[in-house]
Structure formats: C-alpha cells, structure tokens
C-alpha cells in the first residue's frame, strides 16, 4: 500500500492554527485586527471612524467574531466609542457572541457603558491591575468577571493576561484595540497573526490616528515583518493577512487604548 504524506499540509495547518497553537502553548491565538485607509488612518482627525471600510469588509469582521472565542479592546476604545463588541450576523443569537475582554488597568470603564450593562447576557471580562475589591464589586454585580494581572509599566501585563485566559479555556482572541494597545501587544510578543482591512479612501490629517502607535522603531530594519502574506478583495476594500516573523519584546512601554 502506497502512502502519501503532507498532502495539503500548509492548508491544513492554516485551517487548524488556533487549535495547534492552543494545544501546544495553552495560550490564546491572538489576531491583531484593524481597519485603515490607504494613507494608514483608522479615523479622521476628529476621531470619526464610522465607517472606514465598506459593507463587505465589515461583514467579514463579524464572521470572524463569530468564529473566534474572544474579542479584546483597551479602555480607551470603550471611553471613545462605547461599543457593544458583538457579532451582528443575521440569524445569530447571544450564544454566538465572543467573550468581551477590556484591558483597564485602573478600572475606568463606565458602569453605564453598553458593555457593562449587557454583561449578564454576554460574557465580559475586565483585566485590571487594580486590586481593590471594593472597586471590583459594582462590575461583578453587573455580571463582569474581573481578572487581576501584575502591573507592567503602569498597565495590564498582557503576557500574564494571556496565561489567565488560556486557563479559562479561551483559545483565541481578536485584538481590536487602538494604536497604543496594538503596539503593546506586539511589544509583549503575544500576536500570532495580523489582519489589516484596507479601505480605498484617504483621510489625511497629521493628528489622525494610526493602527500602531507607541514609541515606534528606530530604523526600518527593526520593524516587525510578516510572512505568508495573503491579500483578499472584499468589495472595494482589501484584507491583508500575515504572520509576524518573530516576537519583539524590546519596543518601548506598554499602553492601553
């Protein structure tokens, strides 16, 4: 009997990348996801970001939210946008929504925010460095789960947070943070995949936000490079996907946004 090995090996690995990563490391597979214009802006100089991409790209994002276990943002995103972070696909119920994770080192998330008010219906985790149980209680009573991490540069220790999430059985996280949290995730070396939705628009603006902020790199040679890149057309927009060649751990201070 003749046996052929490694048939469609790369395709199978890609299809099961979350499972393989979680089984080998017991840590979530983290996808850094953002939408930007052709000139690299995630919002206008006024902060307006609805919508950067078109309907096809946004529908793809919600299919991703339906597929992966959790979605994570920083408290800055909650304060700026008051998002629900749900899966808005036709025919889906609350059970299809991802677990929502907020990185909030000092517990600034408003109790009246949509996320906290819906925490009893949709699983919600607040990751914080604040150890004051009295400050935890209003969130717990609202239905949130509190995870306390060590403090790293004044912010949530993302590596420790991933360890705790893995222990809870969360095998995958879509990171939809702002530029500072995205930089922190790259700095912590927790990102396994990058998904950039690129719109056929130009926003301009010196003060307009970009997908990755923080300190930045000194030279192009220091940059995080992606391998196994793939480009997919989504209506008038594009999805560019790739995998960081190596984890960078000396990239400046951690931040949340």
Q: Residue ranges of each PLM-predicted region?
A:
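Active-site-proximal cofactor/substrate-binding loop regions of enzyme domains
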Residues: 1-6
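A short acidic, often aromatic-flanked loop/helix-cap motif at beta-alpha or helix-coil junctions
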Residues: 8-14, 108, 152-157, 235-239
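Flexible, gly/pro- and Lys/Arg-enriched active-site loops
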Residues: 187-226
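Short gly/pro/ser/thr-enriched loop/turn and capping motifs at secondary-structure boundaries
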Residues: 10-11, 79, 108-110, 133-134, ...
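Short, loop-centered acidic/histidine patches that primarily coordinate divalent metals
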Residues: 178, 197-200, 234
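Conserved histidine-centered catalytic loops in small-molecule metabolism enzymes
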Residues: 131, 214-257
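Active-site ligand-binding patch in enzyme domains
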Residues: 17-38, 42-171, 180-183, 253, ...
């Amino acid at each position: 009997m003749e046996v052929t090995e490694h048939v469609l090996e790369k395709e199978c690995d890609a299809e099961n990348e979350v499972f393989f990563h979680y089984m080998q490391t017991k840590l979530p597979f983290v996808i850094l996801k953002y939408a930007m214009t052709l000139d690299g802006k995630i919002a206008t100089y006024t902060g307006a970001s609805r919508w950067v991409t078109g309907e096809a790209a946004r529908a793809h994002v919600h299919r991703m939210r339906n597929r992966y276990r959790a979605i994570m943002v920083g408290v800055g995103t909650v304060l700026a946008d008051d998002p629900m972070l749900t899966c808005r696909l036709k025919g889906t119920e609350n059970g299809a929504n991802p677990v929502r994770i907020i990185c909030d080192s000092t517990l600034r998330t408003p109790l009246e925010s949509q996320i906290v008010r819906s925490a009893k219906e949709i699983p919600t985790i607040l990751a914080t460095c604040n150890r004051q149980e009295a400050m935890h209680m209003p969130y717990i009573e609202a239905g949130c789960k509190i995870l306390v991490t060590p403090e790293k540069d004044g912010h949530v220790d993302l590596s420790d947070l991933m360890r705790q999430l893995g222990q809870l059985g969360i095998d995958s996280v879509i990171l939809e943070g702002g530029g500072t949290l995205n930089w922190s995730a790259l700095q912590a070396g927790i990102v396994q995949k990058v998904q950039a939705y690129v719109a056929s628009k130009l926003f301009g603006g010196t003060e307009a936000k970009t997908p990755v902020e923080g300190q930045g790199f000194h030279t192009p040679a220091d940059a995080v490079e992606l391998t196994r890149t793939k480009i997919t057309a989504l209506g008038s927009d594009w999805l560019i996907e790739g995998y960081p060649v190596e984890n960078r751990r000396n990239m400046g201070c951690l931040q949340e946004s």
